[in-house]
Design a protein with these regions (language model features):
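Catalytic cores of secreted/periplasmic or lumenal enzymes
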Residues: 1-454
Length: 454
């Protein structure tokens, strides 16, 4: 965020900090950024940018440490090169800090709030900042970190109460090197009015931090359009998978409900319609981790299928068109109020259990079952790769072709492709009725498949 320039719209939260050139600048000294990127970038996908995972990391980190809810919007775009320098440094003057935050779009009062909110956590480490923190030679603090307040792992207003009471040990407020006491200069720049208000009211501190953190996360380069605020959906199906085994279509998946009231004898049903116009239902079973508490609420999960987790066995010709979920006789909706909603299900292209592995050359024959009545233009491999900056690229290669000799049943034909083993993440994609879908990951490792007939 600190690289943003409100005048020309450049910089902001765009994950440019992942570039080694930007991390090597004196303003970004230490390994904190590299460590953070190494963790959070792994959660990015082709659909979710690294910049969005950085933003979400702050949202979750603050909440799990006792802080307020921060409105989250998605849609950040990862930078393709380092941004211009401009991160404030502790040895700079108050005027330069005020100017720096103004360039980013924040007033002097907001600057005080952002620094206080950010410094409710953490501290300053000796190794990258020997001119701020002495070596402590403490076996309980081997990295010699001087904390901003006495509750460095918890969100609270102690950063303000300790500062106002004169008991603070904040190394940027009462450090031995007054040149780097930037917090002292910033906090006192309005006569301590803002910090005193934070010290007097934990509620004000919390609400103000939520507002400022949200603005910080939403500071993006010109032209980037963020989404509306994202909140957990009341109903969210996931991990939908199909396997065709002869005339049987194995159907597995789960569904997550948000903030259900506790109830031990709840009746949960999956309802679905098939291609022949019939409707069906099956009892949902609790997932292994059926209920997980989060700061915002509770996620309750169920799975489809039998006790052995094999999934539902559907007649291949009938298949499935859409599904709904019912709890205690009431259809569940994507909205907080409503009469339920159909979730469309795609069974036009599915994995076939006739897929197999050639053990002698580390190659698999992947068979995809294609519904005869579907308008399927192509079936292909999608390969995901990450470049040196962790950006994910997707290429479409290796198209499947129909196998006229592999008639499985009256509903499906088999399209086949031999695929060599790879360390890249690969999926099967298909174009159906002019729309491209990603079906799911290829089975890995290859030896998990049955051996191909010799």
């Amino acid at each position: 965020m600190a690289t943003h320039n409100v005048e020309d719209g450049t910089g902001g939260l765009d994950a440019s900090i992942r570039f080694a050139e930007e991390q090597a600048r004196a303003e970004n000294v230490g390994d904190g950024f590299a460590n953070t990127i190494s963790v959070l970038s792994g959660f990015s996908t082709r659909y979710t940018s690294i910049a969005d995972t950085i933003a979400l990391g702050l949202v979750m980190g603050v909440q799990f440490c006792g802080g307020p809810r921060i409105p989250f919007r998605g849609g950040r775009i990862d930078a393709t090169e380092p941004n211009s320098p401009g991160v404030p440094e502790p040895d700079q003057t108050l005027d330069s800090h005020i100017a720096s935050f103004a360039r980013q779009g924040f007033t002097q009062e907001e600057m005080i709030g952002l620094v206080a909110c950010g410094h409710t956590f953490g501290g300053v480490q000796h190794d990258p900042f020997p001119n701020i923190v002495h070596e402590m030679n403490d076996t309980n603090n081997t990295e010699s970190v001087a904390h901003f307040d006495t509750t460095e792992l918890h969100f609270d207003n102690n950063i303000a109460t300790e500062y106002i009471s004169g008991t603070t040990q904040n190394p940027l407020a009462v450090g031995f090197n007054d040149t780097t006491n930037s917090d002292k200069r910033i906090f006192g720049s309005d006569g301590n009015v803002t910090m005193r208000s934070f010290a007097d009211s934990p509620e004000l501190f919390s609400s103000r931090c939520s507002e400022l953190f949200a603005r910080m996360l939403d500071t993006v380069p010109k032209g980037v359009q963020l989404s509306e605020v994202i909140t957990p959906l009341p109903v969210k199906p996931g991990r939908i998978e199909f396997k065709l085994d002869g005339d049987v279509l194995q159907f597995t998946g789960n569904v997550r409900f948000w903030n259900l009231a506790e109830k031990s004898n709840r009746i949960a049903l999956l309802l679905w319609s098939d291609h022949l116009g019939a409707t069906h239902n099956s009892t949902l079973l609790p997932s292994l981790s059926s209920s997980i508490d989060y700061p915002q609420g509770t996620a309750t999960s169920y799975r489809f299928g039998g006790e052995d987790a094999s999934g539902l066995s559907l007649d291949a010709a009938a298949g499935i068109v859409n599904m709904q979920f019912m709890l205690d006789g009431k259809l569940q909706s994507q909205q907080d109020a409503g009469a339920g909603v159909d979730f469309a299900v795609q069974d036009a292209v599915v994995f076939s259990t006739t897929s197999c592995f050639f053990g002698n050359n580390a190659t698999a024959r992947y068979d995809m079952a294609v519904r005869k009545t579907a308008n399927v233009k192509s079936v292909y491999i999608e390969t995901e790769t990450r470049d040196d900056s962790s950006h994910i690229g997707v290429t479409e290669t290796d198209f499947f072709s129909p196998d006229p000799n592999a008639a499985v049943n009256s509903a499906y034909t088999i399209w086949t492709l031999n695929v060599a083993g790879s360390f890249n993440t690969r999926y099967v994609g298909a174009e159906i009725d002019g729309v491209k879908y990603t079906m799911g990951k290829l089975f890995t490792p290859l030896p998990a498949l049955p051996s191909c007939p010799s």
